[in-house]
Regions:
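Conserved alpha/beta-hydrolase "nucleophile elbow" surrounding the catalytic nucleophile
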Residues: 32, 95-100
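The alpha/beta-hydrolase serine catalytic core
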Residues: 127, 132-174
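N-terminal cap/lid segment of alpha/beta-hydrolase-fold proteins
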Residues: 1-13
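Conserved HGGG/HGGXW glycine-rich cap/lid loop of the alpha/beta-hydrolase fold
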Residues: 12-64
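Catalytic active-site module of serine/aspartate enzymes centered on a nucleophile-bearing elbow/loop
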Residues: 205-241
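Flexible "cap/lid" loop of the alpha/beta hydrolase fold
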Residues: 101-109, 115-143
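Active-site loop/oxyanion-hole signature of alpha/beta-hydrolase fold enzymes
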Residues: 39-46, 54-94, 227
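Conserved serine/cysteine hydrolase catalytic core
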Residues: 158-201, 206-209, 217-218, 222
């Protein structure tokens, strides 16, 4: 059974969910989306097949809500604080939606510690939302519960306000990491043009579309993405699943 653990980043208490067990030489560190909390994934953690942790950056779930530190580089350092709490060695990074930007931000500063990367329905960029979109998102629901119950409202607004448009495409391509990318059938957050760019810049990547999934690629099958990640990280380790 997964357990809640905490670590510290510059005085900010960060929560993460930890499956425990054998990390097989490199645990999975999963950085989910803006409206996710770690508990969303408790049921599927065993299916990853090795020790897996789910990060809650500041302002999310059970993590602290400081007055500042909501810029991209600081949120990336939250990811790094959890990584360091779990291991001093390499990890397999898994991301979903907006968590992708913060995970990649950390990876680009610590490339020798990243054994593979799997991205769920996003592109390697920090993106800006159009005016009005953040509040509409935060006033809505995600996976059946109000978003305001998942993320601190003021912290989320600060996160969107501190965001800066940043591209990681070229830097990430230079790392030549084993890469898995899954996009949803909505083709909104990963357009056909961006999908083609993935093919050009990452010719060895595994690119898969879940044509029956909305942006929440854990629907309708909660374990489909997890199984792909499991096979991906095992292959990156040079061992069978």
């Amino acid at each position: 059974m997964a357990v809640s653990r905490f670590t510290d980043n510059g005085g900010v208490r960060l929560h993460f969910l930890d499956s425990g067990g054998d990390d097989r030489g490199a645990p999975i560190v999963f950085v989910p989306g803006m409206t996710c909390v770690a508990e969303d994934y408790a049921e599927v953690l065993p299916a990853f097949g090795r020790r897996t942790v789910v990060v809650e950056i500041r302002g999310h779930g059970r993590s602290g809500v400081p007055a500042d530190g909501y810029d991209g580089p600081t949120l990336s350092s939250d990811v790094g604080a959890v990584v360091d709490a779990v291991t001093s060695g390499p990890v397999h990074l898994v991301t979903f939606s907006r968590g992708t930007a913060y995970a990649i931000g950390w990876a680009l500063r610590h490339p020798t510690r990243v054994r593979s990367l799997a991205i769920g329905d996003y592109i390697p960029e920090e993106r800006l939302l159009p005016p009005g979109a953040p509040r509409r998102l935060l006033d809505g629901r995600w996976r059946g519960t109000p978003v305001r119950d998942r993320v601190d409202y003021d912290a989320a607004i600060k996160t969107f306000e501190r965001a800066r448009a940043r591209s990681f495409w070229n830097e990430l391509a230079r790392l030549r990491l084993p890469l898995l990318v899954v996009r949803s059938g909505e083709r909104v957050l990963v357009t056909d043009e961006q999908w083609s760019r993935y093919r050009r810049e990452f010719p060895d990547a595994t690119l898969i579309e879940f044509s029956d999934s909305p942006h929440d690629i854990f629907r309708p099958d909660r374990r489909r993405f997890v199984q792909l990640v499991r096979d991906h990280v095992d292959h990156a380790d040079g061992r069978p699943s």
